[in-house]
Design a protein with these regions (language model features):
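Acetyl-CoA-dependent GNAT
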Residues: 2-7, 11-84, 88-101, 134, ...
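Short amphipathic helical patch at the helix-1/turn junction of helix-turn-helix
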Residues: 77, 111-112
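Short phosphate-binding/catalytic loops that engage adenosine nucleotides
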Residues: 86, 103-106, 126
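Conserved short alpha-helix immediately C-terminal to the canonical SAM/SAH-binding motif I
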Residues: 90, 114-117
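Conserved active-site tyrosine of GNAT-family acetyltransferases
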Residues: 121, 126, 149
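Conserved catalytic-core motifs of GNAT/GCN5-like acyltransferases
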Residues: 107-109, 127-144
Length: 157
């Protein structure tokens, strides 16, 4: 693992959907389809940011801003680059862009058993505001609860 906190982040486009879906499949047990990612990236109010190297994407975040609220739809980091700071870097970049697009608060759902993600969101200043019972399906097929987290966004100067 290489420290990648300062890796440049670029806007993701629908043409990136194939490689982002492949990364999502490496990062999650229930990956998103290429078409779902492409459709989101083509949508209005959607934020898509990615970090990459010569081999392809290392991480990405999809978010959207609607009526003053921003939501992280997914954030994925290649397993070989986890705990490198990349997730926090992508989250900060998406938060900044969401604030510039009028977002006053940022929301997300996270599995109660995803300790790495919970640590990331805690360090980023998110607080628990709700619980969605059975929101996810675990690897064993059983329902897994999701925490709903919120963080106020600082308005850009």
């Amino acid at each position: 693992m290489t420290k990648v906190q300062q890796r440049p982040v670029r806007t993701a486009a629908p043409r990136d959907a194939q490689s982002l879906a492949a990364l999502h499949a490496r990062a999650f047990d229930h990956p998103w389809l290429v078409t779902a990612i492409a459709d989101l990236l083509a949508g209005e109010g959607v934020i898509g940011l990615m970090a990459e190297d010569a081999t392809g994407p290392l991480g990405f975040v999809l978010a959207r801003v609607v009526a003053g609220e921003a939501e992280i739809l997914t954030i994925a980091v290649d397993p070989s680059h986890r705990r490198s700071g990349l997730g926090g870097h992508l989250l900060a970049a998406a938060s900044d862009l969401a604030a510039r697009q009028g977002g006053e608060a940022l929301f997300l759902e996270v599995s109660v058993d995803n300790q790495a993600a919970l640590g990331l969101y805690d360090r980023a200043g998110f607080v628990r505001v709700g619980l969605r019972r059975g929101y996810y399906t675990g690897t064993n097929g059983r329902p897994v609860d999701a925490l709903v987290l919120r963080r106020n966004l600082n308005k850009p100067a």
